[in-house]
Swiss-Prot record:
Task performed by this protein: Functions as a ribosomal silencing factor. Interacts with ribosomal protein uL14 (rplN), blocking formation of intersubunit bridge B8. Prevents association of the 30S and 50S ribosomal subunits and the formation of functional ribosomes, thus repressing translation.
Protein name: Ribosomal silencing factor RsfS
InterPro entries reported in the protein's UniProt record: Iojap/RsfS/C7orf30 (IPR004394), NT_sf (IPR043519)
Localisation per UniProt entry: Cytoplasm
Keywords tagged on the record: Cytoplasm, Repressor, Translation regulation
Subunit structure: Interacts with ribosomal protein uL14 (rplN).
Molecular functions (GO terms): ribosomal large subunit binding
Stated family: Belongs to the Iojap/RsfS family.
Primary residence: cytoplasm
Keyword Repeat: no
Taxonomy, superkingdom: Bacteria
GO BP terms: cytosolic ribosome assembly; negative regulation of ribosome biogenesis; negative regulation of translation
Length: 117
């Protein structure tokens, strides 16, 4: 599976659980961590967990290794490392505080298909 296909798989999974303000950043040449960051938020702890759980389920169904999953229990900022794609699922109250889009402001955004934010 290509990095772009992995990104789209993640986008579809978070969108399925109604993640809001879904943004993908192209990190190629900017970060050694991943090629893409996918950033979104949920409006409650339960929704944040549902988004993370759905992504984990979909990844496992596709045989994609989850290298790391952090923050699930607190559901304020869940990080799901899929290798070339790192997904950040924030609680809406935390997203503005951490403002990853501004922190990584030199990273271009990626056009996403099928997402209504």
């Amino acid at each position: 599976m290509s990095n772009q296909e992995l990104l789209q798989l993640a986008v579809n999974a978070v969108d399925d659980k109604k993640a809001e303000q879904v943004v993908a950043l192209n990190m190629k040449g900017i970060s050694l961590i991943a090629d893409f960051f996918l950033i979104c938020h949920g409006n409650s702890e339960k929704q944040v967990q549902a988004i993370a759980h759905e992504l984990k389920k979909v990844a496992q169904e596709q045989g994609i290794e989850i290298k790391r999953l952090e923050g699930y229990e607190q559901a304020r900022w869940v990080l799901i490392d899929l290798g070339d794609v790192v997904v950040h699922v924030f609680h809406k109250d935390e997203r503005a505080y951490y403002n990853l889009e501004k922190l990584w402001g030199d990273a271009p955004t990626v056009e996403l298909e099928g997402v209504i934010s």
